[in-house]
């Protein structure tokens, strides 16, 4: 039993001089354990029950040792945490003591710096208050609101204790002055600033700044007008920050720009006792031409997307129609059902006229027939045509050929000559002896008179090697051919 316990872990706990706990844990060496085993072997062998008891006791000892180690570790961590808290408290107390000492020193310095004249004026002021007590009470008692603080100056020097308020505070007439400071969050608008961006685009940007006074005494003693100074600083900061940004970054990263501007202003106004809470970029005004260009670009992009969407829709619709056509081609009953559905939809629209499509199979028989040929009138033999036009000069033949198809003149005189046939061809029998007074639609009168003179001077035409035949016996239409 003693050998087994000696083979367990041995823990030594010691308390150092500085209050920390040291835990030392060591194991029995292998040589000692082997010697213990040899001594146990020399002893008379015990029963199996004794061996079991020894093994269980050794396990219990090990468990107890581990538990004690854990408890010691927890206690050491607690002690270290307490020591840290104590050190922090001591540091804070030391800082408070230093501040109190500094305040006492400042108060003593202020009292010493008043001098003899200061003390004389102070005593006279207190005497004046005492002798005019009912009236002076109204002049000495002042009130500041919950959101205000009063910074008091006596003979031009800051009074110890910092700003007064909220509530009632007393001042000494004639030697004390005070200034109220509002501690609420204030805001001002940064006027629009003309800024040249990084990509050489001129824009007008305005913003809003939210700030508050964090230290009333510093805001009065270190800067003349904290709000005005912060406003001027915000204008220059806005120009400096946005000058390093592109137009796309100005339009998309407004939150990052606002955060960067707020950080910069807060660091710059900290010596003034001002805390910048928030900065917001209100508007980025672009030139009119640039706005139009951007609008046109956006519209073109939207149209392109719309075309892509329409094309994709048509593609899907065509695929669906293809599949529907394949299904309808496989089953003729589906086509008949579709036909009936179409008729039903047409009749449901309250139309007075319903169109029933005629089957194309029945129209195919009519479409295969060829139209009848139009018979041409018999042409005049070449000999007769050459005979008829042989006696006239070339300029007459050209005139007759060009005017033959378009003449529509009608004779209004008895013996006048001219082209008076319905086909517009010349007939020799119509030649007269005198000038013709015939008028032709679309033909000048002088031209008709020349044709009449020519017809009167033309000799009779006779066919060679045949009997005398007058041209008037021929059809005027054949003369053209």
From Swiss-Prot:
Biased composition range(s): Low complexity: 1-22, 433-447
Subcellular location: Membrane
A GO BP entry: mechanosensory behavior
Task performed by this protein: Subunit of an amiloride-sensitive cation channel (degenerin channel complex) permeable for sodium, potassium, lithium and N-methylglucamine, and required for mechanosensory transduction (touch sensitivity). Positively regulates the activity of the putative mechanosensory transduction channel. May link the mechanosensory channel and the microtubule cytoskeleton of the touch receptor neurons. Required for the function of a set of six touch receptor neurons.
Polar residues bias locations: 27-38, 463-473
Name of this protein: Mechanosensory protein 2
Gene Ontology CC annotations of this record: neuron projection; neuron projection membrane; plasma membrane
Recorded name of the encoding gene: mec-2
Region (Disordered): 1-67, 80-104, 403-481
Organism: Caenorhabditis elegans
Main location, first listed in the record: membrane
Keywords: Ion channel, Ion transport, Membrane, Potassium, Potassium transport, Sodium, Sodium channel, Sodium transport, Transmembrane, Transmembrane helix, Transport
